[in-house]
Curated annotation (Swiss-Prot):
Its EC number is 5.6.1.7. GO terms for cellular component: cytoplasm. Keywords: ATP-binding, Chaperone, Cytoplasm, Isomerase, Nucleotide-binding. InterPro entries: Chaperonin_Cpn60_CS, Cpn60/GroEL, Cpn60/GroEL/TCP-1, GroEL-like_apical_dom_sf, GROEL-like_equatorial_sf, TCP-1-like_intermed_sf. This is Chaperonin GroEL. Together with its co-chaperonin GroES, plays an essential role in assisting protein folding. The GroEL-GroES system forms a nano-cage that allows encapsulation of the non-native substrate proteins and provides a physical environment optimized to promote and accelerate protein folding. It comes from Buchnera aphidicola subsp. Schizaphis graminum (strain Sg).
Length: 548
């Protein structure tokens, strides 16, 4: 283990503070409707331009290791806020910077850091309660549009598109963001359950003009096994042929004699049939087959459950109003499953999402949830250049997260007004001693920082505007986009309560740890000895001279 560089007390805190300020100053210029752009250099390709706080924070690494520790701790605030609510990263960074700066001034003046932290925590707990009281539900399309517009940096088209997507697939539906091919943003909605497996043979196609397979009111056979022997399938094929309905087979694989027999039967018109592979792999495939069986009201034929395909009957098959299959996807529309069973399955998947630890697992579970809930919406972002496309896509994703947060916990007045009102309501809060009172005042002062920065970025005087907003009541605030005062809700400037709450809680948590830091330890930079060896005349072969 190499030698360490250790710094104590004020010396350590000053270094850490310098790192905090470098990162926060780079991030906070993006805040508000008149926030500025930040250009990020990339090791290859064109530089990217962004107004997204967390994108800026992720790029920053400082040369001085002590300063870098400060910067990384604030980066953690931005990441945590982003993970919790999907937005509010710039606000969280700004709140953390303000608490750390004011808090360290108090520590330098001789205050007890632990009491300062207790005061800050007390103020934040009270502020969160007040935020909940100020919050109003966000359920109608107009409010969702407004939240989306604000979070997409005043892009009304994006706000309207997100509201339309939520209306079509529901608040729980999956909405994904993809890069489009044109200049305009587009919304594509897939109703029913769709999975990425196409037909196993083009001979199943019954709509040659569009190249798809379309089955009306089909039976659906689900098998968690490979099917290669046609004898296993004969009893069920005969039963389906008598019923006069088409059949969709979803199995791990279908090959050889079994596939050939199905193709021949389909082409001769004996049984209208199509076959696709089951989606996913391993345990995920088993779970998705189970989802399809619940959605269609059938059973999965599984050898693990001692079920035999040869003995299966029409009772084991699922049903749907319509199935559409192309070369890449299968869509099941109007499954005949019981609503209660589907709701129970949805509840089970929600529970799994809460317990999942990896982002990948959560994403896959959310996809399954949406497919059972009734649809997937795809927002296709259009732009003229690749640089603009990346910037726009990041903004649309932010706006989508913000609207979801708004639906979950409601909305408060935006533009930094909610935190100013909260600070006013808890201004009489007191701690157990004077040091805790100073901690409370540090937190209250920090709650004004977002409004001050929004005003500063728009080119006005922060103190004048902040005092005017403080003199007002309720939702009265400053609209930086139009440079006028009024009701923020009427202006359509809303913030999701969850975003504001998460930003405040995470900022106070990390800032409190930084204020109570007394020692910092990092590796000493190593001297590069390889250059000394390379410059020696023997080129690293010294010591061999005596062998002559």
């Amino acid at each position: 283990m190499g030698a360490k560089d250790v710094k104590f007390g004020n010396e350590a805190r000053i270094k850490m503070l310098r790192g905090v300020n470098v990162l926060a100053d780079a991030v906070k210029v993006t805040l508000g409707p008149k926030g500025r752009n930040v250009v990020l250099d990339k090791s290859f390709g064109a530089p990217s331009i962004t107004k997204d706080g967390v994108s800026v924070a992720r790029e920053i690494e400082l040369e001085d290791k002590f300063e870098n520790m400060g910067a990384q701790m604030v980066k953690e605030v931005a990441s945590k806020a982003n993970d919790a609510a999907g937005d509010g990263t710039t606000t969280a960074t700004l709140l953390a910077q303000s608490i750390v700066n004011e808090g360290l001034k108090a520590v330098a003046a001789g205050m007890n850091p632990m009491d300062l932290k207790r005061g800050i925590d007390k103020a934040v707990i009270s502020a969160v309660e007040e935020l909940k009281n100020l919050s109003v539900p966000c359920s109608d399309s107009k409010a969702i549009t407004q939240v989306g517009t604000i979070s997409a940096n005043a892009d009304e088209k994006v706000g309207a598109l997100i509201a339309e997507a939520m209306e079509k697939v529901g608040n729980d539906g999956v909405i994904t963001v993809e890069e489009g091919t044109g200049l305009q943003n587009e919304l594509e909605v897939v109703k029913g359950m769709q999975f990425d497996r196409g037909y196993l043979s083009p001979y199943f196609i019954n709509k040659p003009e569009t190249g798809i397979v379309e089955l009306e009111n089909p039976y659906i056979l689900m098998a968690d096994k490979k099917i290669s022997n046609v004898r296993e399938m004969l009893p069920i094929l005969e039963s389906v042929a008598k019923s006069g309905k088409p059949l969709l087979i979803i199995s791990e694989d279908l090959e050889g004699e079994a596939l050939a027999t199905l193709v021949v039967n389909s082409m001769r018109g004996i049984v209208k049939v199509a076959a696709v592979k089951a989606p996913g792999f391993g345990d995920r495939r088993k779970a998705m087959l189970q989802d399809i069986s619940i959605l269609t009201g059938g059973s999965v034929i599984s050898e693990e459950l001692a079920m035999d395909l040869e003995k299966s009957t029409l009772e084991d098959l699922g049903q749907a109003k319509r199935v559409v299959i192309n070369k890449d996807t299968t869509t099941i529309i109007g499954g005949s499953g019981e609503k209660q069973a589907i709701q129970s399955r949805i509840g089970q998947i929600r529970q799994e999402i809460q317990e999942a630890t990896s982002d990948y697992d959560k994403e896959k579970l959310n996809e399954r949830l949406a497919k059972l809930s009734g649809g997937v919406a795809v927002l296709k972002v259009g732009a003229a250049t690749e640089v603009e496309m990346k910037e726009k896509k990041a903004r649309v994703e932010d706006a989508l997260h913000a609207t979801r947060a708004a639906v979950e916990e409601g909305v408060v007045a935006g533009g930094g007004v909610a935190l100013v009102r909260v600070a006013g309501k808890i201004s009489n809060l007191r701690g157990h001693n004077e040091d805790q009172n100073v901690g409370i005042r540090v937190a209250l002062r920090a709650m004004e920082a977002p409004l001050r920065q929004i005003v500063s970025n728009s080119g006005e005087e922060p103190s004048v505007v902040t005092n005017n907003v403080k003199d007002g009541k309720g939702n009265y605030g400053y609209n930086a986009a139009t440079d006028e005062y009024g009701d923020m809700i009427d202006f359509g400037i809303l913030d999701p309560t969850k975003v504001t709450r998460s930003a405040l809680q995470y900022a106070a948590s990390v800032a409190g740890l930084m204020i109570t830091t007394e020692c910092m330890v990092t590796d000493l930079p190593r001297e590069d000895k390889s250059s000394d060896v390379a410059s020696s005349p023997a080129g690293g072969m010294g010591g061999m001279g005596g062998m002559m």
